[in-house]
From Swiss-Prot:
GO CC annotations on file: cytoplasm
Gene encoding the protein: frr
Organism: Christiangramia forsetii (strain DSM 17595 / CGMCC 1.15422 / KT0803) (Gramella forsetii)
Name of this chain's protein: Ribosome-recycling factor
Biological-process GO terms, alphabetical: translational termination
Function comment: Responsible for the release of ribosomes from messenger RNA at the termination of protein biosynthesis. May increase the efficiency of translation by recycling ribosomes from one round of translation to another.
GO molecular function terms listed in the Swiss-Prot or TrEMBL record: ribosomal large subunit binding
Keyword Transmembrane helix: no
Length: 183
């Protein structure tokens, strides 16, 4: 019985990783309103090494269309601007001497559809990951030295687990699509 529990736990961990990865990927897809996570991929030159923006500055959202970046050291303002430009996020940073301000433009209908398509592709990748974990668990169960009845009930359990995770992925996608399409 221990072997079966181990196989099921391993499958569950793999499926959970697919969900975590999906959430991380979707957080990089820009919806209508400004969010500090939009700048998650921005790297800044800091004392000769590339450092994530969040480690050298505070990122705030004063309103739904604005990002405000306060560097911990004022000397970093130009490096932060450069990092934002190099990240190729489509933002035009403005330097006011104290901080960097980014006005997030509203999304066009066409861009919303592109982002929605991108979100669907990420969700599909996550589903493929979950199905691969199911396939691996099924193969390991077949190799295990267990009775037919236990094999059948364990396979059913793996399928149930798979269905649960696929449903979670669909819910996450629906929320993100709603967020993207809301004007």
């Amino acid at each position: 019985m221990d072997e079966v529990e181990f196989i099921l736990e391993e499958a569950k961990e793999g499926m959970e990783k697919a969900i975590t990865h999906l959430k991380k990927q979707l957080s990089n897809i820009r919806a209508g309103k400004a969010s500090p996570s939009m700048l998650g991929s921005v790297m800044v030159e800091y004392y000769g090494s590339q450092t994530p923006l969040q480690q050298v500055a505070n990122v705030n959202t004063p309103d739904a269309r604005t990002l405000s970046i306060q560097p911990f050291e004022k000397s970093l303002i130009t490096e932060i601007e450069r990092g934002i430009m190099l990240a190729n996020l489509g933002f035009n940073p403005m330097n006011n001497g104290e901080s960097v301000i980014i006005n997030v433009p509203p999304l066009t209908e066409e861009r919303r559809k592109q982002l929605s398509k991108q979100a669907k592709a990420e969700a599909e990748d996550a589903k493929v990951g979950v199905r691969n974990d199911r396939k691996q668990a099924m193969q390991e169960l077949k190799k295990a030295d267990i009775s037919e009845d236990l094999l059948k009930s364990s396979e059913d359990e793996v399928q149930e687990l798979t269905n649960t995770y696929i449903e979670r992925i669909d819910k996450i996608l629906t929320v993100k699509e709603t967020e993207i399409m809301t004007v």
